[in-house]
Every structure is written in C-alpha cells, then in structure tokens.
Amino acid sequence: MMKNETSNFQIGRFLIEQRSFIALIILIAIVSMINPDFFSVDNILNILRQTSVNAIIAVGMTFVILIAGIDLSVGSVLALTGAIAASMVSIELPIFLVIPVVLLIGTLLGGISGVIVAKGKVQAFIATLVTMTLLRGITMVYTDGRPITTGFSDNADLFASIGTGYVLGIPVPIWIMSIVFAVAWYILKDTPIGRYIYALGGNEAATQLSGINVNKIKVFVFAVSGFLSALAGLIVTSRLSSAQPTAGVSYELDAIAAVVVGGTSLMGGKGRVMGTLIGALIIGFLNNALNLLDISSYYQMIAKALVILVAVLADNYLGTKKL
C-alpha cells in the first residue's frame, strides 16, 4: 500500500513539474494529425526561427520574474537599439563595432531600470512602465517616426545574415537562441549569482540579512534583460533590413506569456529557464498551427490568452499543491 502511494506521488509530481513539456507534446501531436505539413522539417525550422526573438527576450524576462519583478520595457529597448543598429549600418560602420555598441546600450538601458527599482525603491511594474514609455518616445524622436533602412552595401548584407543567414543548414537566429539558453541555464544552475537570484525571489529580507547585496542582483537581472532585448533587436532589424519605430510593441506580453507558460512563478523564486524555452515553443507552435489551420488572428489572440490563463491557474492550484 505504501509503495503504491509513493509511486502515485512520484507520477503526480512528474506530471506537475513537466506539465509544460507534456502540453507541448500534446499540441504537436494533435496539430500533426490535423495537418501533416505541420511536422515537416522546413516548418519546424520556420517555427523555431520565428520563436527565437520572443524566446531570447523571455530569457531576460525569466531572470527578472525570478526575483518577483517584471520588465515592461523590453519592446521599447528592442525598438531603440534596433534603430541605432540600422543607422550605424546605414553609414557603413563595421559590424564588429555595431554589435557590441548596440548590446552595450541595451545593457545600460536595462541597468537604468534596475537602478530605479533597486535604489529608487520603485515597484518594477511602475519603473519599467516609465522606461517603456520614455524609450518609445526617444525611439520616435530618433527615427522621426519613420523606418530606418540599413542600405544596400556589403556591410548591410553581412548584417542581414544575422537574421536571415544559415549555419550548417540551421538559421542563425536558432543558433543564437540556443547559445543564450545554454548560457542562461548555466548561470542560474551552477553559479553563485544564479543561487542569489533564486534566494532573492524566494525571500528578499532573508537574502539581505545573509549578507547578499540584493541591489546589485536587481540591477544585474534588469541589465541582462536589456542586453537580451538589444540582441533580439539586432535579429529583428537584420531580418527586415530596416528598423521600424513601432517594433517590439506588445513583445513584453509574449515574453511574459512564455515565462508563465513555462512554469516560472510570478511570485518569484521558482522556475527554470528551460521551462521558458518550452513556453516560448508552445506560443510559437500554437501561432503557427492556427495559421496553418487558417484561423483568424483575432481568434489567435483569444487562444493565446486562454493558454496564459490555464498556465497561471496551473501555477496557483497545481504547482503549490501538496501531493
């Protein structure tokens, strides 16, 4: 009897902990039966490429949410850094200069949000709402509300390869996404800073009493979010060969959705970056499946909202349930 109870406990625990992965497998299986073209190699690579931008932003969002924060400015950081990248490429500045400069700017912009939260004692929602609006306004001023094209030089072609190129038959954005997740997984799992992030999200007061500088951790996670938003901005701009002043609008919602669907708690202290990858894939596969089934984008918004709702309810009622 005791053995059966233990077995049931382990099965239940597995189903709860792996619910996002199980949901992804079920989604793929159902849509593959409805439309055999869904599981073709070309379509899978296309989904992964389309998902890469949201997935990369969602990694930064995971860091922030793990400390019970939120970053609403990611889309605005993407837009501004993308515009800066496009203008630098258009005057034929070398790519090896453009990339680090843009990533540094993104890191600094994210760090500013972190400083406002840490030093100004402002709630992350309010702080990043301010920076989101401010940076969007700066982007509009910088671009004069018009797209900035990268031009037609060899330099522009090289830059475009970031978003459209292939390495070993796999799109470059997928490689970038894979590297980002691998590095993030290592940081959160095997480094002191990763342990501090989980500790801060679990209990800020106790973390501070243990001698950990919580303000530095807060600035760090927002800087990471800014860095990855800028990286996503490079991919989007290079793919389109232009920077749109409205780029990144509502990207913060997709990123939050990926994190929540992936099982990271909005209360902080609990979650995995690989869960975020699964969450981003669920969103990406769902969007692609609905497109293949020729379902209106209006219904796609409803479907995405329902998926997020189910994920939040699962976190509230399953993730915390004692089995």
UniProtKB/Swiss-Prot annotation:
- Note the InterPro entries from the entry: ABC_transp_permease
Origin species: Haemophilus influenzae (strain ATCC 51907 / DSM 11121 / KW20 / Rd)
Presence of keyword Repeat: no
Which protein family is named in the record?
Answer: Belongs to the binding-protein-dependent transport system permease family. AraH/RbsC subfamily.
- What is the topology of this protein in the membrane according to its UniProt annotation? Multi-pass membrane protein
Record-linked CDD domains: TM_PBP1_transp_AraH_like
Instruction: State the protein's purpose.
Output: Part of the ABC transporter complex RbsABC involved in ribose import. Probably responsible for the translocation of the substrate across the membrane.
Q: Does the keyword Transport apply?
A: yes
Sorted keywords for this record are: Cell inner membrane, Cell membrane, Membrane, Sugar transport, Transmembrane, Transmembrane helix, Transport
Q: Which GO terms describe its molecular function?
A: transmembrane transporter activity
Task: Tell me which Pfam families the record gives.
Answer: BPD_transp_2 (PF02653)
Protein's recorded name:
Ribose import permease protein RbsC
Principal location = membrane
Could you give the subunit structure recorded for this chain? The complex is composed of an ATP-binding protein (RbsA), two transmembrane proteins (RbsC) and a solute-binding protein (RbsB).
Transmembrane portions of the chain: 21-41, 55-75, 95-115, 122-142, 167-187, 217-237, 273-293
Question: Which subcellular locations apply to this protein?
Answer: Cell inner membrane
Highest taxon of source: Bacteria
Gene that this sequence comes from: rbsC
GO CC terms in record? plasma membrane
